[in-house]
Amino acid sequence: MEKKCGMVIFFLLVLLQATAQDKIEFKLKKDSVETTGRIKLATDVYLPDENKTYPVILVRTPYQKENFQKNAIKFIKQGYAVVVQDCRGKFGSGGAFYAFKNEREDGLKTIDWIKKQPWHNGKVAGYGGSYVGYTQWAVSDRLDGVCAVMTSADIYDLIYPQGLFSLATAFNWGFEVDARTMNPISSGKILKSYWHLPLSTADDSTFKDNRFINDWLLHETRDIYWISFNHRGNAKGPVLSIAGWYDICLLSQINDFLSIDKRNGHPGSRLIIGPWCHGPQSYRNEYGGRDKTGNREALMERFLACNIKGEHEDVLQSPFTGHKYNFFIMERNEYFGSESWPPKEVEKVDYFLGENKILTKAPDKPVQLKFEYDPLDPYPSLGGTFLGRAVGPAIQNTNTVRKDQWVFESEVLDTPLTLLGIVSASLYVSSTMEQTVFMILVQDVFPNDTIINIQEGGKQVKIVNNKATKIELESWPTGYQLNPGHKLRIVITSGWFPRYNRNLNTGEPIFSAREIQTAIQTIYFGPEHPSKITLPLLYPKP
């Protein structure tokens, strides 16, 4: 006789009184799914009625399955069965946790188990964000719908976006999650770990040896290690991908959706990018509230009802999801829809670096500017696209006194300047060190001189013999309007720490690098070295 994959531990009838008049009756089944190596994955099954069949919402989480009960009850009321599971090595599940490694194997075993259950009607959809979203991507070819929020299918793009190591994201999350429950590590220890050299022993000094963080540091390039975690473009059914302009997964999430669109092209798939981030914002801005930005939970529920149950087809015509690509324009506080990325409606316009640090329409007089980049005093990242506290838009004025930057500004705007896409820079630079980093920071100067970050980006560059070398930089994408009375501010520097690790200017592998060198950076602009910024401008429709 075939051995059953899961064994029922106990079965509960639950009465939840939401209000004095409203009682929700459901059945909670405590079960387990057996995966490779006879490891048992703790699994909760929520059923409206055990004698009927339902479409299934699958949630696999490293953050304790019981924390999803409120959402599970909400979905029960909408006519779903809900399966919530602790990931391998987390909370009630057996085995050892290694970030991202086992999610496809364990997810496939779980889907096979669901399909054998008498309460399953043939449909299984994924739901969730962040790591829970990744567990969907890992098995997206076996799901009838994917509902993923601020997540990534390609983990290399998350840990090494643009080839730069996501120090704060990796350490903030990786140290905390590397335990069966969650590690209560103090913020002081985490902050200290950012400065530790070599980075490969920062985990030992902070808490304990962390296998997956050590492996991340060892594999700086997109090699077979990262390919094994890459599930980009595999979805067969409709996908709702909700991203944030200040989210750590933004760059990857856009590429994830582009890949799905190219391979799959499902008419029900949608990408929404709103003014959101992966943690509490530093500078509060409601951008007009949910009436303007959209209610993410409601959008996901209607998307699932439309694509899994055949209801609410009007979700595809809403102001937030009416196009394949839907972009919230911050400070304009409305959505712009397109059928492509980059949007064909965007025009690229060049602005040259000019004398007196002004952005000009044509190359100005020849100028050279220098600064010293010292890894012992790296340029601080304030807000932006990282995981932690005080993320997203943040006041940048404390950085204005720093000497390790070149700053260029537009004239005061008399009409709106609307950015939608990537701000790129074509620069002529030199460095006293052969291997270094350059960053581009895009910012908004308000009429009261408050400076807010719009977006950032950068990369490692190689400079031979300190000669003027043309490099290309790109910010992460943004959707942002600078309003009349504001100024566009562009900063070129060599750090954004601790969002990214310090480049030590030696070219050593970051796993073992200890030696620190100071670099003298030079930028050239003018007719012979036409350094420029290219803006993706979206003009208002007449």
Report each predicted region and the residues it spans.
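Glycine/threonine-rich phosphate-binding loop and adjacent beta-strand/alpha-helix elements that clamp
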Residues: 27, 32, 296, 311-542
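Short beta-strand/loop motif that positions the catalytic acidic residue
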Residues: 241-243
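Accessory cap/linker subdomain of secreted extracellular hydrolases
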Residues: 77, 141-234
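Alpha/beta-hydrolase fold nucleophile elbow
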Residues: 119-130
